[in-house]
A protein has these predicted regions:
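GT-A fold catalytic core of metal-dependent nucleotide-sugar glycosyltransferases
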Residues: 79-146, 182
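N-terminal anchoring/stem segment of glycosyltransferases
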Residues: 1-82, 89-93, 221, 225, ...
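A structural signal for short, well-ordered beta-strand segments and their strand-loop junctions
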Residues: 5-7, 49-54, 98-101, 106, ...
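Catalytic core and acceptor-binding pocket of nucleotide-sugar-dependent glycosyltransferases
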Residues: 157-278
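Charged, glycine/proline-rich intrinsically disordered loops and linkers
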Residues: 16-24, 62-74, 133-167, 204-216
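Long, compositionally biased intrinsically disordered regions
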Residues: 265, 280-293
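Short catalytic/ligand-binding loop motif for oxyanion handling, primarily in non-cytosolic enzymes
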Residues: 13-15, 59-62, 106-109, 114-115, ...
């Protein structure tokens, strides 16, 4: 059984411009050695290959493809689409594939490939990330505030808007976070992400521009978001899917910044990019993992 864990590292220095509206790229530069060493250690411990894909001709050519398809938005969004393009390239070489963002810290030696049977379907995790009253209010197409482009409420609304526009039954209760994805070749092929991009983005332009279920201050924040697109394609293409659950995708963000990860948290996703907080974990003493030589 050929197994792979892969990630992407492209920083704003390499790409020659900022990463859009998102301010955390310097944090990834600073903590790159620590995070890569930990991810590689995990891959080695479970007998999987580990690959880091960076800025180079493959990524430049991919951005050219996006521009030719008229779906290019920014370097940041290109990186998010790139993870699926890479999966499509890798599916002929590996039986089971785990993608994790560089800000994911493996906090276990348990083998995810043995614990979750990916032959039963690709696996991701979705979660609500809003105040309880707004989670409820979103079900009526409204919020008490104008969300940001990257808020889960915006992505979830976009996912539902796409499904509604195309008369597709939403297969996922909540939009997936694609920072951790357990994949198999048949699932990757059935999602058909890159080949579907142009058509889906035309649909996004439609649902963004016309009145619909969601308030205009929500739809006005729609972008060509990979997580909404992926979730829609899983639904539209009837891809067999299972949930990773919070143990395999424990989210650390602004909502729970003061909360230490549970000892049961196997993969910690530092969406807040506060990598220095890992030094305070009682479950691991990981600052020694930083390569200083």
């Amino acid at each position: 059984m050929n197994r792979l864990i892969y990630t992407i590292y492209i920083n704003h220095f390499e790409i020659g411009e900022n990463m859009g509206k998102y301010e955390h790229s310097q944090d990834l530069v600073d903590y790159f050695p620590m995070m890569v060493k930990r991810q590689k250690h995990y891959a080695d411990s479970i007998g999987a290959d580990y690959k880091i894909f960076g800025y180079g001709q493959r990524f430049i050519s991919f951005m050219d493809i996006l521009k030719e398809k008229n779906v290019y938005e920014s370097p940041y969004q290109s990186i998010q689409h790139f993870k699926f393009y890479l999966a499509e390239e890798l599916k002929d070489q590996y039986d089971e594939i785990l993608y994790m963002d560089l800000d994911v810290y493996p906090n276990t030696n348990e083998n995810i490939f043995e614990s979750i049977d990916v032959s039963k379907g690709i696996a991701t995790h979705g979660y609500h990330d809003d105040r309880p009253e707004n989670v409820v209010l979103l079900e009526s197409g409204k919020l008490t505030y104008q969300p940001m482009e990257r808020s889960i409420s915006t992505k979830h609304a976009l996912y539902n808007s796409l499904c509604s526009e195309m008369d597709v039954n939403p297969a996922l209760d909540i939009v997936s976070n694609t920072g951790i994805m357990l994949l198999n070749p048949s699932g990757i092929e059935k999602v058909n992400y890159t080949n579907s991009l142009y058509d889906v983005i035309q649909k996004i332009d439609v649902v963004k521009s016309k009145p619909g279920f969601y308030a205009g201050y929500i739809t006005g924040q729609y972008t060509y978001n990979n997580e909404a697109i992926f979730s829609y394609l899983v639904s539209a293409n009837k891809v067999v899917h299972q949930q990773l659950g919070p143990q395999w995708h424990w989210v650390w963000n602004h909502r729970n910044l003061d909360q230490k990860p549970s000892k049961e948290a196997k993969f910690i996703h530092l969406i807040n990019k506060q990598f220095g907080l890992l030094n305070g974990l009682e479950i691991k003493k990981i600052y020694d993992e930083i390569i200083r030589r």
